[in-house]
Amino acid sequence: MIALIQRVKRASVSVDNTIVGKIDQGLLVLLGIEREDNIEKMVKLATKVINYRVFSDEDGKMNLNLAQVGGQLLVVSQFTLAADTGKGLRPSFSCAATPEQADRLYLAFVEYCRQQGVMTQTGQFGADMQVELVNDGPVTFNLQV
């Protein structure tokens, strides 16, 4: 399971020119789910995302997590993160989860974050989405479990 997280001042995701998810300060999470992923991996990654210290403290050091800054999450499914790009000039998605498995784990990730008290918005699983964001930094991390 892969989470490409970006610290943002604000972000939104639209489907058919309609905003379906929108946050202010927080993290945009592009979530890629692979065939070998399961609930245990989801909990581990969601916990890491929520607690990852990527926000600056009073000394300008990345030392604060999402809750400590009152941040929000915008979680967007992105199966292309599971691509194998090692060979040739075309990505292979053989490592990506099936749509059914990915949807189940995506929804579980979102629900887990909400249960932890994090205000969490989402995109629409499987849809063609447009994501807009204002990067803060930019600060981007690729987290994997």
From Swiss-Prot:
An individual GO BP term: D-amino acid catabolic process
UniProt key word Hydrolase: yes
Chain positions of motif Gly-cisPro motif, important for rejection of L-amino acids: 137-138
InterPro entries reported in the protein's UniProt record: Daa-tRNA_deacyls_DTD, DTD-like_sf
Keywords of the record: Cytoplasm, Hydrolase, RNA-binding, tRNA-binding
GO MF entries: D-tyrosyl-tRNA(Tyr) deacylase activity; Gly-tRNA(Ala) deacylase activity; Ser(Gly)-tRNA(Ala) hydrolase activity; tRNA binding
Family: Belongs to the DTD family.
Subunit structure, interactors included: Homodimer.
UniProt function note: An aminoacyl-tRNA editing enzyme that deacylates mischarged D-aminoacyl-tRNAs. Also deacylates mischarged glycyl-tRNA(Ala), protecting cells against glycine mischarging by AlaRS. Acts via tRNA-based rather than protein-based catalysis; rejects L-amino acids rather than detecting D-amino acids in the active site. By recycling D-aminoacyl-tRNA to D-amino acids and free tRNA molecules, this enzyme counteracts the toxicity associated with the formation of D-aminoacyl-tRNA entities in vivo and helps enforce protein L-homochirality.
UniProt-recorded name of the protein: D-aminoacyl-tRNA deacylase
Gene: dtd
